[in-house]
Structure formats: structure tokens, C-alpha cells
Amino acid sequence: MSRFPAVAGRAPRRQEEGERSRDLQEERPSAVCIADREEKGCTSQEGGTTPTFPIQKQRKKIIQAVRDNSFLIVTGNTGSGKTTQLPKYLYEAGFSQHGMIGVTQPRKVAAISVAQRVAEEMKCTLGSKVGYQVRFDDCSSKETAIKYMTDGCLLKHILGDPNLTKFSVIILDEAHERTLTTDILFGLLKKLFQEKSPNRKEHLKVVVMSATMELAKLSAFFGNCPIFDIPGRLYPVREKFCNLIGPRDRENTAYIQAIVKVTMDIHLNEMAGDILVFLTGQFEIEKSCELLFQMAESVDYDYDVQDTTLDGLLILPCYGSMTTDQQRRIFLPPPPGIRKCVISTNISATSLTIDGIRYVVDGGFVKQLNHNPRLGLDILEVVPISKSEALQRSGRAGRTASGKCFRIYSKDFWNQCMPDHVIPEIKRTSLTSVVLTLKCLAIHDVIRFPYLDPPNERLILEALKQLYQCDAIDRSGHVTRLGLSMVEFPLPPHLTCAVIKAASLDCEDLLLPIAAMLSVENVFIRPVDPEYQKEAEQRHRELAAKAGGFNDFATLAVIFEQCKSSGAPASWCQKHWIHWRCLFSAFRVEAQLRELIRKLKQQSDFPRETFEGPKHEVLRRCLCAGYFKNVARRSVGRTFCTMDGRGSPVHIHPSSALHEQETKLEWIVFHEVLVTTKVYARIVCPIRYEWVRDLLPKLHEFNAHDLSSVARREVREDARRRWTNKENVKQLKDGISKDVLKKMQRRNDDKSISDARARFLERKQQRTQDHSDTRKETG
């Protein structure tokens, strides 16, 4: 199990005192050290205390700027106080009298932690005057005046209240991250003001906040709105390129040892000050924590450390799936004589401000979701960060004093491999969910929606195609009754389809735990230590065996049910090497999904179906109903080919219970793909062809022009030909033609399969006969 946070150092007495000190601090409901705030803070009108920020000198001016403009762009260095102080200023200026002040964040961790911090500064209980809402967790009330939320939650608000009548101010924070949902919110808010709806509040204000972005472009998009710059420089940060990664290493992200070495060198050779290390994800972070702890334990603090005031190193991981209490620890000051080292994902680059950081180690990579046109799927990839992200990271070292940033890559890597700015998510990921949302908002022409950066038309057409395959839209591109139901679920469309199919068969109990487990981080703990690794793998195999050993989806359901029914779920998770925090989140998700299904089944026109068969077959049939795009057929040996027209080869992931049984399988359905040395299918179960026989043809029925809902009167014949040519070119690029499609369909029907089996048996019988004749001749 993970031992972190942990202190590595000399003098057990000193270490134990430090741990007791930290435990006492954790008993306080605080995200920052209250004593530290009071020492250097100032008093707000609410009677609380807040740190000193550059924005405080601009308080009156920025309040007036919000009053005078429908749209306002606010920019300033990270740590200038935009996120925590501006909503408070607007509240104290009376803006909340006309509705809530809504503040969006791209990540749920940031939304929760910032809400906690502001609630403390305003001396109120979290969920009362200050609250938050993230997916599956709403900590707000009728009393809430300042509401922090993920951008996805605001999009859900707009579905139920297109004119945002419950809000007086909308603040879109961290706009420079260019998440898919934030870009859609840009367009919706612009459209709301352009249409001048009689139901829209005249006093609604929109503030877009960004640390680094193309501000002139954003201002032009919002009608040349003013840009309010918060002056205030950071302390100087000295940068050093460590030259451990060059342009040739772009695809090689096995750099953990280098990161740990640089971090340890800082601890041994630099004066007091905390360290912030940037890595890409949970596995890398936990592995680095283990390696760093082992190295720090061997340090002789009498001879090895230049700063004689140091007695140890406090190692703290930080990533999205951690519990709120675990995340809170990174904000607390370390015990006396202890240096703090936070090893984090990109969340600490912009969304969270950690006091005391003097040294930053920039790993140079980030996990990013990219659409793979060959596979037709979104793939989570490790890619080089942009130059603007790198500057954000280094800025963390100059918040409270001068600092240093150690970039493990070379200057050539900076120049050749790192783009200037973040590529907007809308230009590189699937648009299926947001296109469905736009359709449900009666925005039918999604191609000519006001995008800040228009996405590739192919991504839009791919989204329309998938929605049509799920029956969320009809042949004309209009949203169906099923589509209106699907948009209520905070799940991907294909998973929502599977859940609704199960509900129609009155067996949602089979699917809801699985849907909940697929909505949280990976629940399996895979330790770095080889001895613990073997034990964990054995426990995981035992859990898979209880599910029949032949269905990864069912394994997730077994884990959910067994943990929930155990008397001590946290202990059960520890014994079976399962992340308890992920299971705890899954329990909450399942309860909310169950409530959505309950309301859906109360509708008089909800479809009802019957099926008589074993539970395991019902489960797999429901999965086929939603995941038929992710169906694959065995090709050669252990390789499977997808049936979506691309024929992409995939392999079953080694973590699957079916990994050693590929040659026994003919047809599978999978949850997602992972690209490493091969393209792997993750979370797999076997299926029968007859379960998807009637579904697979839908993968090839697609009329781009009709589904796009472009107004017919505005489209001439040459435009129609353009749509048709695009589809023909796409099919040629994918290596598939109409003749091939027909052959595939013929190949997969019952008669073809029966004929192929007969030919195989005939050849086998002929070979046996020939072999027998040969033996007679030689005998």
C-alpha cells in the first residue's frame, strides 16, 4: 500500500514530532495554515483573514469594470488572487443580490479546494454561503452565493436554464487551458447575448479569467470587450536546462530516475525552500515517491546536506483521484526542519497555489486526450507540454521569493518539440457529448455554431455518426427522445445506452455498479515493489475468478458488491489491493445513477422489454447495445480486428482476465483502448456474433449532409457533392470501399459463417484422408 505522505530523514524523535505536528494541523478544517495567513494577511469585510495578493490594489477598479461591461477579460500572473478574491469582491459589492456568482474550473480538484479556501476566508461553512458542484457531488444549498463548479456542471445548468436566470455573474476561470467544455461555454454565452432573449437577465455579467492566452483573439470573439490586467510581478526565477531529454527522446517518457535524481540534488545542494515536481499521472507519481523516499532515507544530514537546518524530506503526492483530505495536506506547511516536496500532475501548474515553493522540477510531459482517426477513438497519450505551460510551471517557483526551475529537457527539445500554446481540446478530441448537448439546446446546425476555434469538420461528423448509431439523433440530425434522456446522464453516450438498455429490461442492477466503476479512476492498486506486486496480482486474479474469470466488466461488479457488503470496506480494499477512495466515489456515483434511472422509468412512454436468459448473458447483451462500436473479431493468433469499418488491429491488455485466452475467443467487446507498444483493448468480455449482427450494419449507415442539419435551402448542388466526396475520401483513407463494406456484411451473416465453417470442415476432412492415404502407401 502507499506509504505517502511520509517523512524521510534522520532523528526519529524529530520525525515523530513533525508527524504529530502535521496531525494536529490536519484536525483543523483548513486548506492553508491559519497562523500563517493571520501573520501576513489582511481583514476582509466578512471578518476573515486573507493573504496579500496583487489584485487587492485593483479592487475598486475591477468591480467597476465588471459593472460597466457585459463581457470582461481579466488577466494576471498565476497567484495574483483572481480565483479566490474576485468572487469575494463581487459578493461584497452586492452582485449576489441578483443571483449566484458562478465560477468554473476545468478540474474538480481545483473547484473543491478553492471553494474550501474561500469558505474559510469568509468564515462560513462549506456548502452554505460558499459551495461547490462537481460531477456526482453537489455541496451547495439555497443559501449559496458563490458557487465553484467544473465547466461541465455549468453546461448542465444551461441545459435546464438556458438563460442562466439563477446567476448574476459567470466567471470562466483558467480559460487558457482551452478545455472542450470551456470552448463550448464561450460560444453559448456569446450566443445568449447575441440573441437578446427576453428571459435573459440584463444584469448578467461574464468574466473570462486567464493567466496566459491569446487575449486579443478572445476579446475580438466577445465583441472587442475590454481586457483588465492585474499588475504585479512574480519574483525572478532562474531556469536551468538539465539536458536529460532531447528531441530524439520525444517518444521515450521513461524518465522517472532522472526526475528523482534532479529532485534529490536540489534537496542536498539548495538552501531551504519547498520543491514542486511535475509528472504526468498517478503511476509515475507513486513510483517517484517510492524511489525518492528510498534515496532520502540514506542521506546523512550531518555531511550530505548543504543547508544544515534541514533534518528530513516530507514527500507528498498530488493527483486528481485523491480524497479531499489527502489533497488538503499539500497546502499545509511542513514541520520545522523538514523540506516539503510535492510530486504532482499538471493540476498544480495553474489551478492550485501552494505557498513556500522555491524549486520546480519540470518533467516536460503531460497526459493529453487526442482523437485517433485510425481507431476512431480518443486515446490518452503522453505528449510534450507547450511553452506556455512550461512558463506556468516555472512561475510556481517565484510566488513568495526568488526561485529556480530545473527543466530536465534540453533547449533543443524546447525549440523543436514543444508548441507555443496548448492545442485546444476541441480540435483534438471526440465531440460526441457536447454535440448532443448542443442538439438538446435546439442548436441543430452544430457546424456553424460560434466556436472560438472551429473544430475539424471530420470530428463533428464523427460525433454525429456516433450519436446516430446510438439512436440519440435521427436521420435528419434531430435529437430523439432517447437522446433527450441520454443527455441527463453524466456518462459517455455508449455507456449511457447500455445502462438505459438494462433499465428497459428491468435489470439495471447489473449495469449500474459497472457504470459507476467505469466513471472513476482505475480501482486496481499495482505497487512498484516486486514482492507487493505479486501479492496484488494474486488478489486481483482471485476477484476475477469470483466473476467467472471470463469478463472484466463482471469483475468490476464483483468488486463493487463485495466491498459494499463487507463490514469494513476500507479494510477490504486494503486486503485486496483496491483503491478505497475510488470505491467510495463509485458508491456515490451508483446512487445518483440509480436515481436518474428511477425518474426515467417513471415516464409513461419509457420502453419496456423482456428477455429470458441467464444474468451473465443479459449483462453482455446490454453491453453490446451500447458498445457495439467497440466490437472486435479475432483475426490471426492473438490479434483482433475492430468491426467499425477501419479493421484496426487490437490486442487484449495484459491486465485483463482474458489475456491468456485470446485464441479461445472469436468476438469481444471492450470499454476503451490504450496505446503503448501496441493498441490494447482494456476491460473486455466475450460476446456472440448474433448479439451484434443487427447492430453492426449501423456502423456503415451514414449520410453526412442529412445528419449535419445544415439548412437545405442554403446548400447548392456543389456543396452536396462536397459532402459526398468527403465521405468517399474518408472511406478510402480508412482503406474501405462500398464493395468492401458489402463483402464484410456478407462475410458476417449467418449463411456466410455457416458456409465458411462447412468449407473448413471439408478441408480438414480432406487433409485427414490424404494423410491416411499417405500412411497406407508408405506402410
Swiss-Prot record:
PROSITE patterns: DEAH_ATP_HELICASE, HELICASE_ATP_BIND_1, HELICASE_CTER. Its EC number is 3.6.4.13. SMART domains: DEXDc (SM00487), HA2 (SM00847), HELICc (SM00490). Residues 13-41 have a biased composition (Basic and acidic residues). Residues 1-53, 737-779 are annotated as: Disordered. Keywords: ATP-binding, Helicase, Hydrolase, Nucleotide-binding. It catalyses: ATP + H2O = ADP + phosphate + H(+). ATP binds at residues 76-83. The keyword Hydrolase applies. Residues 63-231 form the Helicase ATP-binding domain. The keyword Ribosomal protein does not apply. Signal peptide: none annotated. It comes from the Eukaryota. InterPro entries: DEAD-box_helicase_OB_fold, DEAD/DEAH_box_helicase_dom, DNA/RNA_helicase_DEAH_CS, HA2_WH, Helicase-assoc_dom, Helicase_ATP-bd, Helicase_C-like, P-loop_NTPase. GO terms for molecular function: 3'-5' RNA helicase activity; ATP binding; ATP hydrolysis activity; RNA binding. Residues 263-442 form the Helicase C-terminal domain. A motif (DEAH box) lies at residues 173-176. Residues 42-53 have a biased composition (Polar residues). PANTHER family: ATP-DEPENDENT RNA HELICASE (PTHR18934), ATP-DEPENDENT RNA HELICASE DHX40-RELATED (PTHR18934:SF271). Probable ATP-dependent RNA helicase. Belongs to the DEAD box helicase family. DEAH subfamily. This is Probable ATP-dependent RNA helicase DHX40. The gene is DHX40.
